[in-house]
């Protein structure tokens, strides 16, 4: 991993970490003010809007980052590509809104749901006009991080000041999306330093259509199986159980996004290396990224299993206690989700294998919906969690079986050593966690003590095992202090 990639990963990790801290501050308050059912309504309508956000996005962001990464040194070609992509994105956004209006008119008579969808759908146009893919393409993660901090602080203040009762459902929803609007305005101004976008009448659809549609189809299918459990749960059991599932899914999603932030920033650089056929350098960088994620992911899932009850009580209170097992199941799913993500997004996208992602996601949704229909009527929110586990691990298995030349891009000898050390950390944290619970009963103290002791013991294990990645990080820190 190059120094630039390391800095970008650190910045993106920090930005995503803030997305954990801020919900930890706001969610306990919001869940108690709005209640289980209102949170279920918000999550249900958000899942509907999510599908139309995908139609508007059309896989364009990923396509722009990959293709732009290969030609970003040529300003003329990049400007042409940017204008083409921006115009296509505007057209897809218009189509998305027309389809959303039609669906709401025909299938969603509930007035409350209609208003929530109307508010949440603002994020669609904000995302299109925000053109955040330009910042990622030019690896300007410092700006992205600073912008994110400012917007999240503003949203936090507005929530605590304005949301006071369960009747503030619409106000809370509006505050949740207004950050996207502010981000959009800031980006429209800031991104002009890189690209001055404009609409064009002549589109080269023959060139862009197929790869964009493959990426869009893959994203749509992934979104369907990501949201299908929530939709099926609402259909069979109602908003209450969606609310229970939502609090566990929120923790799961936050941690998934945190880990994904490590590898998502590498797409422009890996695309550049692959475009120049620097395969050895590609293999070294990708293996390091995979190893770093593995060393963090496996022990993190163990900590989540141990602390699920305490986390649920902290976030939602005793009303959400039935979501404990749900979160423990999703902690297992987290492993499959991240390995699947680093294979599909971190490897297949840079090497142009997005068609594999699409096929794998199609099979994944069949697995997810099939198991959801079978288990949700009986096991409610826990059945939805099991369906998520099955689909996530299926996608990992499918990718390993289909991308047969993965050994060309991954050094499995190095990765296996890190995997074994991560598994050792997994069992250590499980033992430590349940051991500490014998002596400590306070939920917040449990979260703090198990997290602190678990991290210290795990780092000591890695040091004793002479893990090269940890040694490299420690050497960098020592060198930094000596220079300072």
Where are these regions (language model features)?
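Interhelical loop/hinge segments that connect adjacent transmembrane helices in multipass membrane
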Residues: 1, 145, 169-176, 185-226, ...
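Membrane-proximal transmembrane or re-entrant/amphipathic helices at the cytosolic face
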Residues: 434-484
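Alpha-helical transmembrane segments of multi-pass membrane transport and lipid-handling proteins
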Residues: 17, 56-57, 62, 83-111, ...
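Helix-terminus/linker motif at the lipid-water interface of multi-pass membrane proteins
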Residues: 21-39, 161-165, 223-254, 268-273, ...
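N-terminal membrane topogenesis motif
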Residues: 1-22, 76-79, 83, 202-218, ...
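Short runs within selected transmembrane alpha-helices of multi-pass transporters and secretion channels
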Residues: 15, 19-23, 27, 45-53, ...
């Amino acid at each position: 991993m190059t120094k630039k990639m390391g800095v970008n990963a650190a910045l993106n990790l920090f930005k995503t970490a803030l997305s954990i801290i801020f919900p930890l501050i706001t969610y306990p308050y919001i869940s108690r003010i709005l209640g289980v059912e209102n949170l279920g309504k918000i999550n249900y309508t958000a899942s509907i809007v999510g599908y139309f956000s995908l139609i508007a996005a059309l896989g364009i962001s990923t396509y722009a980052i990959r293709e732009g990464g290969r030609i970003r040194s040529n300003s003329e070609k990049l400007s042409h590509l940017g204008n083409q992509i921006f115009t296509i994105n505007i057209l897809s956004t218009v189509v998305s809104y027309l389809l959303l209006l039609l669906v709401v008119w025909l299938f969603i008579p509930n007035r409350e749901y209609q208003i929530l969808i109307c508010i949440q759908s603002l994020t669609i146009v904000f995302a299109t006009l925000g053109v955040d893919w330009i910042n990622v393409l030019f690896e300007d993660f410092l700006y992205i991080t600073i912008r994110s901090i400012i917007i999240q602080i503003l949203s936090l203040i507005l929530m605590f000041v304005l949301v006071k009762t369960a009747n503030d459902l619409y106000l809370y929803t509006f505050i949740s999306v207004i950050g996207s609007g502010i981000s959009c305005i800031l980006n429209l101004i800031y991104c002009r330093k890189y690209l001055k976008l404009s609409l064009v009448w002549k589109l080269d659809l023959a060139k862009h259509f197929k790869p964009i549609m493959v990426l869009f189809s893959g994203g749509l299918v992934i979104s369907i199986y990501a949201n299908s459990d929530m939709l099926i749960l609402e259909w069979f059991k109602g908003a209450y159980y969606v609310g229970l599932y939502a609090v566990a899914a929120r923790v799961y999603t936050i941690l998934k996004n945190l880990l994904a932030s490590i590898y998502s920033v590498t797409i422009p650089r890996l695309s550049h290396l692959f475009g120049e056929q620097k395969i050895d350098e590609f293999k070294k960088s990708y293996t390091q990224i995979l190893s770093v994620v593995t060393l963090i992911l496996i022990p993190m899932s163990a900590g989540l299993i141990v602390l699920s009850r305490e986390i649920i009580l902290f976030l939602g209170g005793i009303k959400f206690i039935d979501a404990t097992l749900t979160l423990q199941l999703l902690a297992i799913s987290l492993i499959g989700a991240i390995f699947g993500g680093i294979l599909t997004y971190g490897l297949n996208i840079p090497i142009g294998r997005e068609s594999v992602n699409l096929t794998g996601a199609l099979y994944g949704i069949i697995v997810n919906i099939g198991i959801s229909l079978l288990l949700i009527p009986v096991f409610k929110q826990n059945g939805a969690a099991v369906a998520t586990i099955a689909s996530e691990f299926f996608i990992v298995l499918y990718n390993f079986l289909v991308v047969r030349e993965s050994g060309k891009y991954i050094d499995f000898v190095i990765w296996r050593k890190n995997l074994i050390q991560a598994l050792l950390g997994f069992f250590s944290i499980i033992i430590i966690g349940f051991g500490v619970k014998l002596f400590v009963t306070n939920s917040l103290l449990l979260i703090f003590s198990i997290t602190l002791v678990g991290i210290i013991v795990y780092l000591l294990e890695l040091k004793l095992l002479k893990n090269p990645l940890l040694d490299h990080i420690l050497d960098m820190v020592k060198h930094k202090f000596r220079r300072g």
